[in-house]
């Protein structure tokens, strides 16, 4: 074969004479008209034409008519440049002219109607296996082109050597069908391939690549030795050096040398029996392959997988990497000491091992190479990707961020700190690493150099923009052109998917299923499931919720019923009432809001359901209500639903269930759910009902296992507001006590305090008159100290600890998310409820830690409903009193942190107007104290009221605002109002009159007639806000003030309902019937019942309505949101015998226990 001179040199594109514009690349003057960034259609047409010309090389040397010396002229600088694509930096305004793309090889994945630029491994960047050598006629042009490229890289032309090399390569291909690169050519090719890598941000170092030529090795053992040398050289005690080891080139595709690992060093990922993954999830498949090949797994989080090496096409061999070669960096944070507790680490050497080097038509499928890490590769991708180690939420939680709220930007804060930790850890151990900002800056410098030196720089914007910081890095604003040049590093198909095994016994068990088969199997399974579900009884599960608790339980119920039924979970506001006629089984899970009202998303269904008169379809139903026995109408909305469905003729499947927030709510739900499920199976005659396996959630036992929990020391400082925000899923903020004043007379045996809270910046305060403030209180120090003195085997009270629990498989420890890292003292003070009587479930667990048999038996007896109810209502014991009653209890810190219930916020009506006091919130609080055992027992104190009464000025108060949309002032201020509130029931009305005063003085808005009805014992004892009321009356804000005194000496008791009956009957009728007025009631439940009863009597008498008509009349008033009730209170054990729904008469405190 003669030397193919036509492939030796190609024509270079002629420049077109242009004047005016400065060319960034070579400073040639351009025409002023060529300034637009977009590529025109003419540009594209010319580019296609020039590409065709480029791919059809023209002969540069005619048969012997020109001497070789004349070829030297071809290297001279041309007079003009070829057409270009303009690349602009939108940050700096600088532009580049890309001409290098004319030398691009192949076609990228983009299509005319779709862009595939974000595909991870597109076909255009992937080389598959071969089953025969590259044909010489395909290989020769590529080889000559590479030789030209190689000799063109010299500053001075070496014409004779160049021609001789072309001749030698030609003859070698003609003789052997392939050719071998010289050592210098190999070095040039590997560096040039790095230079051409469009997805690499660190190419500024391309010329410093160390090349190890391992083309002479023939066995896997030799490959391993070369790799060990490579790792040792590159690691360099932390001063990382970039290097590449090149194994023999591909011949016929049947004798490849390949490294099966994706990277030389990588961590194993283990698929655990419970479905969880231990280690790096990205490596689960490869780890299983290693195990199948004989590797013994260690099941750690950071186990280095062995090298799997294939030599000369033979079956792969496993080699453990010597531990002394693997430099690892333990992660720590410069500020957060707890970061060490995450026990994170990462290897220092990022060595890619599974790519293919293409150069001059030759392919090297084994060529591991490395640079050094950019911090975000570890800190963002390896640690934070959800499909990798996924530590983001754990770090955010430990930082005390609002991980439940995306808008808090907790992810952004956490990922920054993780990356700070990575950079700090590497730098502290003197291991090479580069931050992403420096990397982006270096790439911009490299890119500018490349455009000036060779007129282009292939770059993949999607890969080069770092995974964090986005537009604050310069590469974000840089337009880029992506194309493939030769030499190039290509992706490869995983070796184990294409390898032809010589020893079938060593072949790993095939787990893959062909895509067609898999798709058919999935479709078939879906079809079967649809048929199965269609044949099952349909169940509709409705929920209404304010906080999300009912929704969560509804989905849990759906999971249970999916074992034998076809369930559908629907929010009440999405449910069409007409569907009731098609139901067979309806389940309802709902909470009760306020004074027996339904949650907001249940209002629509409630209105339409309660107006329904009859139902033709007599379906089965069951209802579960959630609430707190502290509220006056416990689970009232659920009871209303239950009764209405029954009146419509539906059949109750099981008795209505109740879940008390203060007494084992979830246990009650699980018990009701299982009972309902079993009843449904019986009723609908479900086949195989005896063998149905229900979810583990419903079968958990009540045993206490101390080995299931452990405490780990933690140094993270507690941010109380952030911790409470996370626990209660609320935006908890901190206010400070400005002042506290006792509103009752010094001679009174009781106390009602005005608590004024303030904050520096009132912008965060956003509330309307009538809304509530949730206060997160602290327990009494005496109770906390008493419990601490009885804890066994616990840490010091002020040592910060973190509770960890074994995962379900019992394989490893996970942080318990119920509590933040804190000291035991902090937990007992701010997070755990130590005043509510223990539930029956907690008593069962306490029985297991009693060391005296009589006490254990007594605790077990108390778990029986009758005994428990008597003991609870008689003693109402705090947790400390339980420990004192049963002194043999050996309670550990782990027991307390894992088993005690969470301390709930307490809610108070706000007694101030934001417009009137912009940086303050006022509360009206009755300080609660009472004796248990019918007044003969120990003195108990209300948790929050006592805590507020003990604060000093400027002490912090964690709190949050809760909306009370049903208790706002009328939208039209001209509408008349009647306000009824005895005792602290006056709290929200103070905010009303302050708002009306502000509107009058600053907006010129005169409100409608506002009548106040207040009640207390005596004017000289507990007539709170008396002077303010008189002032508001004088200023015309309150048009009438009526006070009912119930303890005046020598006079009969007068209550607010008496005032209504005796003095305001006409006013009530005028406001409610003749005008679109509003009536507000705030106070304890018995007062509210008496007031409602009195009002109904008055209206019935005046309008001559019967009982049913008057009930409907007031139902309409509530529906129109003209009759408002805000009724809260706490159940007191000593009043339970008198009234099962007893409340503290004048406290708006959510709980006094």
Swiss-Prot record:
Binding site for Zn(2+): 110, 115
Record's comment on post-translational modification: Polyubiquitinated; mediated by SPSB1, SPSB2 and SPSB4, leading to proteasomal degradation.
Residues the record lists as Phosphoserine modifications: 234, 578, 892
Chief place where the protein resides: cytoplasm
Phosphotyrosine: residues bearing it: 575
CDD domains, alphabetized: NOS_oxygenase_euk
PANTHER family found in the cross-reference section: NITRIC OXIDE SYNTHASE, NITRIC OXIDE SYNTHASE OXYGENASE
Source organism per UniProt: Homo sapiens
Motif (DINNN-motif): 23-27
Positions of the Flavodoxin-like domain: 539-677
Membrane-crossing segments per the record: none
Positions that bind FAD: 772, 906, 908-909, 924, 926, 930, 943-945
Name by which UniProt lists this protein: Nitric oxide synthase, inducible
């Amino acid at each position: 074969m003669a030397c193919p001179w036509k492939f030796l040199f190609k024509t270079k594109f002629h420049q077109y004479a242009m004047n005016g514009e400065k060319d960034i690349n070579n400073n040639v003057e351009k025409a002023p008209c060529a300034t637009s960034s977009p590529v025109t259609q003419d540009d594209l047409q010319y580019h296609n034409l020039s590409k065709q010309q480029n791919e059809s090389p023209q002969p540069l040397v005619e048969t012997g008519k020109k001497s070789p010396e004349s070829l030297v002229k071809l290297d001279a600088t041309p007079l003009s440049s070829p057409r270009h694509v303009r690349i602009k930096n939108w940050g700096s305004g600088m532009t580049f002219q890309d001409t290098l793309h004319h030398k691009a090889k192949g076609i990228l994945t983009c299509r005319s109607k779709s862009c595939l630029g974000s595909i991870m491994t597109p076909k255009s960047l992937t080389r598959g296996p071969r089953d025969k050598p590259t044909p010489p006629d395909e290989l020769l042009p590529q080889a000559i082109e590479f030789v030209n490229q190689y000799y063109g890289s010299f500053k001075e032309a070496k014409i004779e050597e160049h021609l001789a090399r072309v001749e030698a390569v030609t003859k070698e291909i003609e003789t052997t069908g392939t050719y071998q690169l010289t050592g210098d050519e190999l070095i040039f090719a590997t560096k040039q391939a790095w230079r051409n890598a469009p997805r690499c941000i660190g190419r500024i170092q391309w010329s410093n690549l160390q090349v190890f030529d391992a083309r002479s090795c023939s066995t896997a053992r030799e490959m391993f030795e070369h790799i060990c040398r490579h790792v040792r050289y590159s690691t360099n005690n932390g001063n990382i050096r970039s290097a590449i080891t090149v194994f023999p080139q591909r011949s016929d595709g049947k004798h490849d040398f390949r490294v099966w690992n994706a990277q030389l060093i990588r961590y194993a990922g283990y698929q655990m029996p419970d479905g969880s993954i231990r280690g790096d999830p990205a490596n689960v498949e490869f780890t299983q392959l290693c195990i199948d090949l004989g590797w013994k797994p260690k099941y750690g989080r950071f186990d280095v997988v062995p090298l799997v090496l294939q030599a000369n096409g033979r079956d792969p061999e496993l080699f453990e990497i010597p531990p002394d070669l693997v430099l690892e960096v333990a992660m720590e944070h410069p500020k957060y000491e707890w970061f060490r507790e995450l026990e994170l680490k990462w290897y220092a050497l990022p060595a890619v091992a599974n790519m293919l080097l293409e150069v001059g038509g030759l392919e090297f499928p084994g060529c591991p190479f490395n640079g050094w890490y950019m911090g975000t590769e570890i800190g963002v991708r390896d640690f934070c990707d959800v499909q990798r180690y996924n530590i983001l939420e754990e770090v955010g939680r430990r930082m005390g961020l609002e991980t439940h709220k995306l808008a808090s930007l907790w992810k952004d804060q956490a990922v920054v700190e993780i990356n700070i930790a990575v950079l700090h850890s590497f730098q502290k151990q003197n291991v090479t690493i580069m931050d992403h900002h420096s990397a982006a800056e270096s790439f911009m410098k490299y890119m500018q150099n490349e455009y000036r030196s060779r007129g282009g720089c292939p770059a993949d914007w999607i890969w080069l923009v770092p995974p964090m910081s986005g537009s604050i890095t310069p590469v974000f604003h840089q337009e880029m052109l992506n194309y493939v040049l030769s030499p190039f590093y290509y992706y490869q198909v995983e070796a184990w998917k294409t390898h032809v095994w010589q020893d079938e016994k060593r072949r790993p068990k095939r787990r893959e299923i062909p895509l067609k088969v898999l798709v058919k199997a999935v479709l078939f399974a879906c079809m079967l499931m649809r048929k199965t579900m269609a044949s099952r009884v349909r169940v509709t599960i409705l929920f209404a919720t304010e906080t999300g608790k009912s929704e969560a339980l509804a989905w849990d119920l759906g999971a249970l019923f999916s074992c034998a039924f076809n369930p559908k979970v629907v929010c009440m506001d999405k449910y069409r009432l007409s569907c009731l006629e098609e139901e067979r089984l309806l389940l309802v899970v709902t909470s009760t809001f306020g004074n027996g009202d339904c949650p907001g998303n249940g209002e629509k269904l409630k209105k339409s359901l309660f107006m329904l008169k009859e139902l033709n379809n007599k379906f089965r139903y069951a209802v579960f209500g959630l609430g707190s026995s502290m509220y006056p109408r416990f689970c009232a909305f659920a009871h209303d639903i239950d009764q209405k469905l029954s009146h419509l003729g539906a059949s109750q499947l099981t008795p209505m269930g109740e879940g008390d927030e203060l007494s084992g709510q979830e246990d009650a739900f699980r018990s009701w759910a299982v009972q309902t499920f079993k009843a449904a199976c019986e009723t609908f005659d479900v086949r195989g009902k005896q063998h149905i396996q229900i979810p583990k959630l419903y079968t958990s036992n009540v045993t206490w296992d101390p080995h299931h929990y452990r405490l780990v020391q933690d140094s993270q400082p507690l941010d109380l507001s952030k911790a409470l925000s996370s626990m209660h899923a609320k935006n908890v903020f901190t206010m400070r006590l400005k002042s506290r004043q006792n509103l009752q007379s010094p001679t009174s045996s009781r106390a009602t305090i005005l608590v004024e809270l303030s904050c520096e910046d009132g912008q965060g305060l956003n509330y309307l008159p009538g809304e509530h403030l949730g206060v997160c209180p602290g327990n009494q120090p005496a109770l906390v100290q008493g419990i601490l003195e009885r804890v066994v085997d616990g840490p010091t009270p002020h040592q910060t600890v973190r509770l960890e629990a074994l995962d379900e498989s019992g394989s490893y420890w996970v942080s318990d998310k119920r509590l933040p890292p804190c000291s035991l003292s902090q937990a007992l003070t701010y997070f755990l409820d130590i005043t509510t009587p223990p539930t029956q479930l907690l008593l069962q667990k306490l029985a297991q830690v009693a060391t005296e048999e009589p006490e254990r038996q007594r605790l077990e007896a108390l778990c029986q409903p009758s005994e428990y109810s008597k003991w609870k209502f008689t003693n109402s014991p705090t947790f400390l009193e339980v420990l004192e009653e049963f002194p043999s209890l050996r309670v550990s810190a782990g027991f307390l942190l894992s088993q005690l219930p969470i301390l709930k916020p307490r809610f108070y009506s706000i007694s101030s107007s934001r417009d009137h006091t912009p940086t303050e919130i006022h509360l009206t609080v009755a300080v609660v104290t009472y004796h248990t055992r019918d007044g003969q027992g120990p003195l108990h104190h209300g948790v929050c009221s006592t805590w507020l009464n003990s604060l000093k000025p400027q002490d912090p108060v964690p709190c949050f605002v809760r909306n009370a949309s049903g208790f706002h002032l009328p939208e039209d201020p001209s509408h008349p109002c009647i306000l009824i509130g005895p005792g602290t029931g006056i709290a929200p009305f103070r905010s009303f009159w302050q708002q009306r005063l502000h509107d009058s003085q600053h907006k010129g808005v005169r409100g409608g007639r506002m009548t106040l009805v207040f009640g207390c014992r005596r004017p000289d004892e507990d007539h709170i806000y008396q002077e303010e009321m008189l002032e508001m009356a004088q200023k015309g804000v309150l048009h009438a003030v009526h006070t009912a005194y119930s303890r005046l000496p020598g006079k009969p008791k007068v209550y607010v309902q008496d005032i209504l009956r005796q003095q305001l009957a006409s006013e009530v009728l005028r406001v409610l019937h003749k005008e679109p007025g509003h009536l507000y009631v705030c106070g304890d439940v018995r007062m509210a019942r008496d007031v409602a009863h009195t009002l109904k009597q008055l209206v019935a008498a005046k309008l001559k309505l019967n009982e049913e008509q008057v009930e409907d009349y007031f139902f309409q008033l509530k529906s129109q949101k003209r009759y408002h009730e805000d009724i809260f209170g706490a159940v007191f054990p000593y009043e339970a015998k008198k009234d099962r729904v007893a409340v503290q008469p004048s406290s708006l405190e959510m709980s006094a226990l």
